[in-house]
Design a protein with these regions (language model features):
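Amphipathic alpha-helical dimerization/coiled-coil segments
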Residues: 1-21, 39-43, 94-121
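N-terminal helix-turn-helix DNA-binding core of bacterial DNA-binding proteins
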Residues: 17-59, 84-95, 99
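A cross-family signal for key residues in well-ordered alpha-helices
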Residues: 27, 36-39, 71, 77, ...
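Short beta-strand(s) of the beta-wing in winged-helix/HTH DNA-binding folds
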Residues: 48, 59, 71, 76-77
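Alpha-helical residues within the helix-turn-helix
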Residues: 54, 65, 71-72
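Recognition helix of helix-turn-helix DNA-binding domains
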Residues: 62
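Beta-hairpin "wing" of winged helix-turn-helix
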Residues: 72-82, 86-88
Length: 121
């Protein structure tokens, strides 16, 4: 059992955001290429598609489609810098998804503690 199971859910996990709101984030992150793009964008500043495809065998078109899925989920956004289009990570939706996972973890811990109490009674 986790030590957090005896505590009430963290403030951020008290159903502030409906769990359904995080589903598009989890769906977008369910692809290895998109997960890699998020990792790259989290580690640095805004990047162009050319920078994101550098050293990979992924086409510019494929990366553009993956970035659009991530943008639709609210995980990245594009920024115009002159004629160049840069992409950057948007942490807010990831934070919401983390809070959803915290809520689920708390619910499971709470349910397991109740089961343990019944079994030991």
């Amino acid at each position: 059992m986790s030590s957090r199971s005896s505590r009430p859910p963290p403030e951020s996990a008290r159903n502030v955001f409906p769990l359904q709101k995080s589903a598009p984030v989890f769906a977008a992150l369910g692809d290895a290429t998109r997960l890699r793009l998020i990792a790259v964008l989290c580690a640095g500043s805004a990047m162009s598609i050319a920078q994101l495809t550098s050293g990979t065998d992924i086409s510019h078109q494929a990366v553009t489609k993956h970035l659009q899925v991530l943008a639709d989920a609210g995980l990245v956004r594009d920024v115009k810098l002159g004629r160049e289009r840069l992409w950057e990570f948007e942490p807010e939706r990831m934070d919401e998804a983390r809070r959803s996972l915290d809520e689920i973890a708390w619910q499971w811990d709470h349910a397991l503690n109740r089961l343990k109490a019944v079994v030991q009674a």
